[in-house]
Amino acid sequence: MGQTANSCQKMLDGRPADVSGMVVNDPCLMNIPTSFYHSTNQELDLSNKTFKREVGGPFSVMMENKMGKPHLLETDQQNFFRDSKPINEVHSVKGERENSGESEEEEDDDDDDDDEDDEEGEEDEDEVNYKREQIIVEVNLNNQTLNVSKGDKGVAQDSSHIKTSSDDEEGDSGEDDQDSHEDEENNPLPLDGQTNMQHGNQDQKTENSDMVGGDGTIPANSTKELGKGGEAPKRKKKTPKEPKSPSDKAKSEEKETLTCDKCPRVFNTRWYLEKHMNVTHRRMQICDKCGKKFVLESELSLHLQTDCEKNIQCITCNKTFKKLWSLHEHIKIVHGYAEKKFSCEICEKKFYTMAHVRKHLVAHTKDMPFTCETCGKSFKRSMSLKVHSLQHSGEKPFRCENCDERFQYKYQLRSHMSIHIGHKQFMCQWCGKDFNMKQYFDEHMKTHTGEKPFICEICGKSFTSRPNMKRHRRTHTGEKPYPCDVCGMRFRFSNMLKAHKEKCFRVTSPVGVPPALQIALGNPTLSNPSQGVTHLPTAHVPPPSPTPPLNLNVLNTLPPRPIPHPFSHLHLHPHSHTHHLAVPPVPHLPPPPALFKSEALNHRGHNDDSFLRHLAEKTSASQHH
């Protein structure tokens, strides 16, 4: 290592004059000690010396590039290697380097700093500069051509000059070699308008090679610069196309966009549109049952399985569905395999699906947007209006599949199906009780489980269903929401109103018949109705008037009527009237009012008003005669 350091020191001391000139000219390098520069004369003869090598080359020496500048100390250590060459070529390279010393002094200061950082790299660059290929450029102005060819490899004195064959070329080839060297290093200006190929570093060479095409020709823009003063005719430039106006563009777009009438596809040309129409829409797959059209056979088959027919059937109740998910919902809800996981936020009522919750939320709103056009009644849901409209139209959309009987409401069909099945649709497994609606079935099942989730807020009593709790709450509030249409009496429960109508308005006897006629009906042996009142005092008896006998043969043939009402004996027995009435009834006077406002029915189920009116008219006519 000591020998290596000494040899490097000597090599730096023997540095050529061009490097020393750079040191003198550059004020930034005045402080660098000269002990780092050595001449390389002693290192030329390397036959008897050995160095520590990193690679197989004879001049591969590892050396440190630590300099005096602080910015150079920051760089990392790098190993520089010299290309392996025969020893006899080293002397020629050195001589050429000394001859070119004057030209190297005129380089820029920036290049000097880069060369000082990398000393061995500078020597390699010098060797590369002398290895440049000879380029021959031939210019023919008559034919307006420019031919570029490469000469023999090697370093020659004539390599600095470019041979050109031009009629307008002036005699500039007589310049000195020194001028040629200066032209190489200082990038001279073009001579008489002709482009000169410059011999610089590798970057300049690559730039020139990019200017030259792969076939050895230079682009046309460089040849146009060669001809001046009308020596060669210029090529005509292609006139650029005028840009289309917006209206023209809109017209072209309208022409290009052709839309299919049967599908949303868009085409650029009419040919593609006609092809699309022939292939797609003229070979449509048509459903034989509903008439729908499909492009593909797979779409038609899927339509036949799902939408066209109800082919998906429930195994338990044989109900058919269009969609598979509808069957799943049916199995979960109807057959009791699902749980009510979704609850209403307002009333906490639970449902099977969230869709049912959304439908239920309408019940909490006061809006009734659906109004019947016939009677003006409003509803919250469209389905409620649809069911209500069946009352006006008389339509019966629900048909029994077993006997083809039709019904107006669905619950009626459920009740009817129990005839064919033998029991109602929902049957309790504990007690055997069956129900037509699942709502009632669920309420009944809570009686077996003991579940009573609905609690009264006033007394704390619990109930199995919400309607039962609401009915119980009326006992606390005193509310009576069920009024009687006849007498105006109000009731707390609907069953109480029903019982009130059955007891008070079910009268089967003719209430408007006079008592004299009732006596004749009870005792047919009496021919004169005045005989029935002979025991009354004379003061109150009016003068007798002859009355013709009534033909009551039809009345005698009537069967006896039942008397279920407890107050009906007041109208049939005459002694009750004699005790209360001071004046006996007169046959031609209107009958007394009934205890209750009702309509009497005869044995045929018709009103008795017409019969009584006929009797009154007949008696009045006989009196006038």
From Swiss-Prot:
Keywords per UniProt: DNA-binding, Metal-binding, Nucleus, Repeat, Transcription, Transcription regulation, Zinc, Zinc-finger
Sequence ranges of Basic and acidic residues compositional bias: 82-100, 150-166, 240-255
GO CC field: nucleus
Gene3D superfamilies in UniProt: Classic Zinc Finger (3.30.160.60)
Record keyword Translocase present: no
Entry's Gene Ontology BP terms: regulation of transcription by RNA polymerase II
Main localisation: nucleus
PROSITE patterns: ZINC_FINGER_C2H2_1, ZINC_FINGER_C2H2_2
Subcellular location: Nucleus
Biased composition (Acidic residues): 101-127, 167-186
Pfam family, one: zf-C2H2
InterPro entries: Znf_C2H2_sf (IPR036236), Znf_C2H2_type (IPR013087)
Record-level Gene Ontology MF annotations: DNA-binding transcription activator activity, RNA polymerase II-specific; DNA-binding transcription factor activity, RNA polymerase II-specific; RNA polymerase II cis-regulatory region sequence-specific DNA binding; zinc ion binding
Region (Disordered) residue spans: 80-255
Residue intervals of every C2H2-type zinc finger in the record: 258-281, 285-307, 312-335, 342-364, 370-392, 398-420, 426-448, 454-476, 482-505
Function: May be involved in transcriptional regulation.
Similarity field: Belongs to the krueppel C2H2-type zinc-finger protein family.
Protein name: Zinc finger protein 652-A
Organism: Xenopus laevis
Lineage, broadest ranks: Eukaryota, Metazoa, Chordata, Craniata, Vertebrata
